[in-house]
From Swiss-Prot:
Gene3D superfamilies: 3.30.1370.30, 3.30.1490.10. Part of the 30S ribosomal subunit. Contacts proteins S5 and S12. One of the primary rRNA binding proteins, it binds directly to 16S rRNA central domain where it helps coordinate assembly of the platform of the 30S subunit. Belongs to the universal ribosomal protein uS8 family. One of its GO terms (molecular function) is structural constituent of ribosome. One of its GO terms (biological process) is translation. Keywords: Ribonucleoprotein, Ribosomal protein, RNA-binding, rRNA-binding. This is Small ribosomal subunit protein uS8. InterPro entries: Ribosomal_uS8, Ribosomal_uS8_CS, Ribosomal_uS8_sf.
Length: 131
């Protein structure tokens, strides 16, 4: 089966596992997913991730919860979709919950947060919001 939107699949798997309070979630691997997960780990939304390099590579994401088993990820939303791409210039880069959340932006310098994109003065495709 061909996956038409791997980013939406990644976000949905994380959202569902997070709501069910699963400690880990597995998904098929891709370079784009690894870049997104790297940014999510830097921002503190996930604990860790690892790649299982079998015949069909899989990513195992370890989700992050507080000491009282409270979810760190409150929400995930896909913005730019295959049917409707959403691009933003430097001036129009979105702020998620007045800076409490993060917009994932695909730029010529890789996947960056909205803050990093503003610092580097580059716009790009707004992939998703994480808060």
């Amino acid at each position: 089966m061909v996956m038409t939107d791997p980013i939406a699949d990644l976000l949905t798997r994380i959202r569902n596992a997070n709501k069910a309070r699963h400690p880990k979630v597995d998904m098929p691997s891709s370079k784009l997913k690894l870049e997104i997960l790297k940014v999510m780990k830097q921002e503190g939304f996930i604990k860790d991730f690892s790649v299982n390099k079998d015949k069909f590579p899989k990513i195992t994401v370890t989700l992050k919860y507080s000491d009282t088993n409270e979810r760190v990820i409150k929400g995930l939303k896909r913005i730019s979709k295959p049917g409707l791409r959403v691009y933003a210039s430097i001036d129009n880069l979105p702020r998620v919950l007045n800076g409490l959340g993060v917009a994932l932006v695909s730029t010529s310098k890789g996947i960056l947060t909205d803050r990093e994109a503003r610092q580097q003065q580059i716009g790009g495709e707004v992939l998703a919001y994480v808060w």
